[in-house]
């Protein structure tokens, strides 16, 4: 029997329930995976709250969770892609808050050598989104990039990946996370009035930022981006909407192969994900409460 965390109606995280289910043997093209680590993302609590129902219509009961890492326990008939005992990363649309799941094989990526399950479970969403965004920005050696929300899961991954690309990073975060950004190698700037001027003050002699990744989508971040770029730079956002589009920010487009690419960076030691909380899977509701508060560092991990 597999344990799952699910919800039967939209609401706050406390609508989540814990139950068990019997999994069928995997059919053609399917693989059963025992999850060892499940990563929490802001999209999880937004899914439960109903904020995403326009884009992700659900049939209840529904199970949140889009990234995890674990071990293959069974494969479908005549399947040659993975074998029992293989360590893998899973990335799907939903269904990850489980101890074990039957998933399409094309949602799996081999676990890179030397990368543990918790680190691997952070790769698809935080790492993959950051990687896709920076590639979309065509970021390269010598560029200066501004990352809004640089202490969060996607932001902190982007700080490290940008440096692996040879770029210089200016990152916005709360006062409490300024030293953390320095430890990651970014030049930190606090939120609040005068943000664009503070960024100019640390960017370079000319005060030039030509690329922006916005992971927060606040009025302050959008205004600062518009003031800094003045229509001449490149900007992408992980929180697209009318306001960000009006400010000239494009939505991040996820790249094929991003999980494997970030996995390679992790195996090389060029990116390490900060785990802010480790909690049992059955405490997923509390984990989502923490996640939706924001201003955290890194990732929340559920341990099945």
Where are these regions (language model features)?
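C-terminal capping/lid region of NAD(P)-dependent oxidoreductase domains
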Residues: 272-274, 288-304
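Short amphipathic alpha-helix with an adjacent loop that forms part of the alpha/beta core around
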Residues: 194-207
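N-terminal glycine-rich beta->alpha transition that marks the start or flank
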Residues: 11-15, 20-69
